[in-house]
Every structure is written in C-alpha cells, then in structure tokens.
C-alpha cells in the first residue's frame, strides 16, 4: 500500500512539474513546440516577403521566426538541421531593417523586440537569414528578393 501511494505521489509531482513548461501545449501536426510557441521549417525556397505571407497563412499569429534568446537560437538551428535538406546557403528569419532617416532600425516581423542578436554587422540590405556555414547560428543581412527556405513561428 505504501509503495502504491509513493508511486502515485511521484506521478503527481512529475505532472505538476511539467505543467507550464511547454509539455502541454498543442501545436499543429508536423510542427515543433518550444517555450509556448510552435515552429516549422519549410524546405521550399521563397522570397522573404512571400515566406512571411506564407507563415501568416499557416497558423494563427504565424510569422517568420523571431529569435529572442541563445536557447531559442539553438532550438531553431537544430530544427533547421533536421528538416532543411536543400543546398541553400541561408534560411530566412523574420528580422528586417526598417529604414527611417537618419537611422536604420532592425525589427521582427511578429512585432517582438530585438533583445538578442547574433548578427554580422553589415546592414546594406533589408532582410536577414541564418547561414548554413555557421550551422544556422549567425544572422546575415541578405537581399529580400532571393529565394531561401524559411522557418515559421506561431503562438501555441
């Protein structure tokens, strides 16, 4: 009897510890969950604007991925490595340059603040992607008209 109570208590502790960690959110089929968001890497190359539009059509609140921490960056890099099979050198993310004289300000397409950066400081072009050569961990400034695979992110 004591062993049974101990096992039930242990299961209760595990259940309560998983509550709110992301283990209980519901992402669409073939999407991956991380920190209360759902992610999916798409292998079909698109221009940055077309990829953003596609992401908004895939899920409620969907956008090209915003990366807000080193942990999220690692998760996204792993997701890309496992799912993008094309030979493309870059993968689109949702960071873009908003040119408002006299400044150039970077913004995420989902409206979130840029609080984490891992970018090569070259702001000639308006869009950003993750570079394959850096294992998808460094952000590069790219021409928005180029076609690359991309990652979508939406609230869970």
From Swiss-Prot:
Glycans are attached at residue 141. It holds the Pfam family Lectin_C. SMART domains: CLECT. Its main location: secreted. Disulfide bonds join 27-38, 55-152, 127-144. Residues 1-23 form the signal peptide. Residues 34-153 form the C-type lectin domain. The keyword Glycoprotein applies. Interferes with one step of hemostasis (modulation of platelet aggregation, or coagulation cascade, for example). Belongs to the snaclec family. Shows greater sequence similarity to the alpha than beta subunits compared to other heterodimer snaclecs. This is Snaclec A15.
